[in-house]
């Protein structure tokens, strides 16, 4: 059975996010799509995501565009089902009266969306998340000030670090670009590293939210060792063999099938 367009688009966007270039021939070989299907999907992507450039028989991810909103839109599309699963699990760990840090990123945004009926205090470092929380009447939300990363809407740099020092909370929900048993939590850029590290330092309990694609991967910038993390929340796409390996290493995993 051939894949539906939304599934094809997600596969192509995921490849483009990682490699910044996808040719018609590559899409045909990697995903088994017909040439006519690839061409139609390329045109659809260009129409929906203005930062994508269609060349002769290819698509390119335009990092130089002034329209940075699409960068966030692409990232939010990747592993969207997994992110919603993770957010739903994380929501079960939150009770009325809690005060916690909520990190930046699309998975954390999904958790923010789950807080509409919560009576909590949330400190965040993300413009999108702050905007979401500001709509909920019983959520007392604080946003950390500092430099905003274009296209990602996270807040960082030295001013943000100073403001985080004003808080000390019971729990933090953080995200990451990659994690492995050997190198711990790592990030693709330095921008969020300082904030993540400081949030971990100012929290008594740290919950890492990471979809299955983040496991056994390494990015250039170190954030923390896994010993700093109390619980890792992931999705149903995490292979059992990987889950068992992390559990044997002492990691506490919270997965959809953990709920009986």
Swiss-Prot record:
This is Putative sgc region transcriptional regulator. It comes from the Bacteria. GO terms for molecular function: cis-regulatory region sequence-specific DNA binding; ligand-modulated transcription factor activity. Keywords: DNA-binding, Transcription, Transcription regulation. It comes from Escherichia coli (strain K12). It holds the Pfam family DeoRC. Residues 5-61 form the HTH deoR-type domain. Putative transcriptional regulator for the sgcREAQCX region.
């Amino acid at each position: 059975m051939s894949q539906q367009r939304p599934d094809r688009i997600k596969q192509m966007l995921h490849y483009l996010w990682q490699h910044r270039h996808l040719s018609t021939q590559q899409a045909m070989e990697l995903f088994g799509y017909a040439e006519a299907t690839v061409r139609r999907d390329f045109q659809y992507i260009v129409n929906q995501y203005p930062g994508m450039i269609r060349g002769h028989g290819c698509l390119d991810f335009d990092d130089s565009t002034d329209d940075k909103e699409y960068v966030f839109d692409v990232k939010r599309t990747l592993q969207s089902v997994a992110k919603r699963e993770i957010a739903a699990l994380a929501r079960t760990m939150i009770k009325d009266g809690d005060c916690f840090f909520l990190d930046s990123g699309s998975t954390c945004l999904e958790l923010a969306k789950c807080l509409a009926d919560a009576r909590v205090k949330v400190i965040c470092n993300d413009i999108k998340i702050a905007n979401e929380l500001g709509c909920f009447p019983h959520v007392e939300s604080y946003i950390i000030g500092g430099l905003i990363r274009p296209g990602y809407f996270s807040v960082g740099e030295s001013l943000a670090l100073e403001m985080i020092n004003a808080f000390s909370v019971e729990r933090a929900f953080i995200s990451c670009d990659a994690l492995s048993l050997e190198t711990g939590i790592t990030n693709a850029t330095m921008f969020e590293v300082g904030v993540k590290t400081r949030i971990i330092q100012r929290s008594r309990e740290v919950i890492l939210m990471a979809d299955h694609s983040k496991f056994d991967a390494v990015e250039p910038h170190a954030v923390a060792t896994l010993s700093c993390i109390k619980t890792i929340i992931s999705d149903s796409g995490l292979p059992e063999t990987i889950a068992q390996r992390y559990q044997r290493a002492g990691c506490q995993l919270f997965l959809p099938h953990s709920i009986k």
